Amino acid sequence: MKLLFPILLLTGSYFLSACNNTQSLMSSTHTIAASDPHIQVMGRTHINDDASLTFGYPGVSLSTIVAGSRLTAEMQSSNGNSWIDVIIDNHPPTSIKLDAQQQTVELFHFPNSGEHRVEIIHRSENWHGQVTLKQLTLTGTQFLPAPVLPQRKILVLGDSVTCGEAIDRVAGEDKNTRWWNARESYGMLTAKALDAQVQLVCWGGRGLIRSWNGKTDDANLPDFYQFTLGDTGQAPQWDHHRYQPDLIISAIGTNDFSPGIPDRATYINTYTRFVRTLLDNHPQATIVLTEGAILNGDKKAALVSYIGETRQQLHSNRVFYASSSHHPGDNSDAHPTKDQHAAMARELTPQLRQIMDW
């Protein structure tokens, strides 16, 4: 009986110590660089010397799974005009505008620790600014193995429509970068329907041979296809071995035809050379050419004809055509609306299923 009190005291001390250790473990912090393998990346990114990631194309997505109560990200936008969507456990997204200076973005904060899946999606496009993700910091137990991407791979090449411009338009509001929403674009919706990962490589206002205003000295599709981000001679060049798509969709031509129907031979010869580059760089890929959603009437008919002759010149059983209906936007903006993007995906998906036998 004399030993009972010391034993109980020792036992109580043990449980108190264990409880404190558990609380300490649950409240500890863990920081990983953006290029850490616990973060799954979809889209073109540039790995910097400090292991951070910089990206500019829309739809770039970074996802991770963690056990903890709070997760933050150190991020910035070079121009302060970029937006991201943050999705926690498949709940509706939260849209966040990034500053030009590095900021701490709180991705989630819960009273209790638990397992959570987190996804960051770049809503904006290159000319809004390049986004840098430096690191993630977790309050909790650990970063778990990263989510696995679908095996099928799609590359979508295009202009502002592919970038998701004006999907989130607001009637009566001056147009701003909040209106872009790559997540709801036809390309990402189509990839989701086909159970595929996707890269959007697109630039608003650009075309195959000229921009919307007729300029020919901008970086148009054959140029910016080669970039990781940016559109100047100093832009990091993309290593095509990093991503070998099964399917490439080229939806270009709206801006080429905006000033008028371009010279037939110039357009077809340029498109033929570019598609040959795609065939060489991606020897296992099927390539689908489409006219996009904005053109109508004579311009649409001319572009469809140019695409047909491009295919004839290539003589390749890997190059196909997919048709697109006219989706004219609304009174707020000529770009397709959110509902029209969904309709575009519904139109495109069965054509691609048949071509790919998916």
Curated annotation (Swiss-Prot):
Involved in the degradation of plant cell wall polysaccharides. Catalyzes the deacetylation of acetylated birchwood xylan and glucomannan, with equal efficiency, and of the synthetic substrate 4-nitrophenyl acetate (4-NPAc). Does not bind cellulose, cellohexaose and beta-glucan. The record marks 205, 255 as: Transition state stabilizer. This is Acetylxylan esterase / glucomannan deacetylase. It catalyses: Deacetylation of xylans and xylo-oligosaccharides. It is found in: Cell membrane. SUPFAM superfamilies: SGNH hydrolase. InterPro entries: CE2_N, CE2A, CtCE2-like_dom, PCW_deacetylase/CE, SGNH_hydro, SGNH_hydro_sf. Disulfide bonds: none annotated. Residues 1-18 form the signal peptide. A lipid is attached at residue 19 (S-diacylglycerol cysteine). Pathway: Glycan degradation; xylan degradation. The gene is axe2C. A lipid is attached at residue 19 (N-palmitoyl cysteine). Its main location: membrane. GO terms for molecular function: acetylxylan esterase activity; hydrolase activity, acting on glycosyl bonds. CDD domains: Endoglucanase_E_like (cd01831). Belongs to the carbohydrate esterase 2 (CE2) family.
